[in-house]
Every structure is written in structure tokens, then in C-alpha cells.
Amino acid sequence: MIDQLSPTDFAAWQAAAAPKTAVVLDVREPWELQTASITADGFELLHIPMQSLPGRMADFKQQHAADQPIACLCHHGIRSMQVANYLAQHGFTAVVNLQGGIQAWAEQVDPSIAQY
């Protein structure tokens, strides 16, 4: 079962991940990333579109430990939940889904982020 993480709880989750660096995996398409994006602040921000992840999984596994704290992000939280489940099926044990996606992040954390 993948935990749902609200944007307002992200800072506490990130702090709890220490000393490991948390990863935010943004699975949106490149045009979406250009429209609206969060800024890496004490975490690694990684962009791999959902459809590209299977082909990049071997590299992803080499670069990230199975217990690496990973929060998956998309527009509304649906694609990211699918990716979170995919990562869990591939042995990642500290995966959460950013509930509501970047839309919720813009509404609850950073209103300067464009909404689309």
C-alpha cells in the first residue's frame, strides 16, 4: 500500500528522511514541466515522464537505493500513484504519492506555481 502525502506534510516527510536525501520524482510530460514546476529545496528533483520510466528503470535502480525516500508527483496525483506502485513492485520500499499533485502543491504550499 502506497502512502498518500499531502503537500503540507512534505516538509515533515523530508525531514524524517534525513540523513538520506529525499527524491521528488516528477512523472509529468515535458510540456507540463515547462508550464509549472516545483523548485528543489533540500531534495533531489528528478523528471522522468511516466511512459519513459520502464526504459530507464535499470539506471534508476543503479542511482537510487531501494530504501531511498521517493515522493512521486504529477498533475493531480493519479499518474504518480501508478508510478509509485510500479516502483514498489520493483523493490522500492520508501515510496509515497504526493496527493493532489502539483495542483494541490500550488494551492497549499506555493501559490506562485502556475495552475493548468
Predicted segments with their positions:
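Rhodanese-like catalytic fold shared by cysteine-dependent sulfurtransferases
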Residues: M1-V23, V27-I70, I78-Y116
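Short cysteine clusters
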Residues: C74
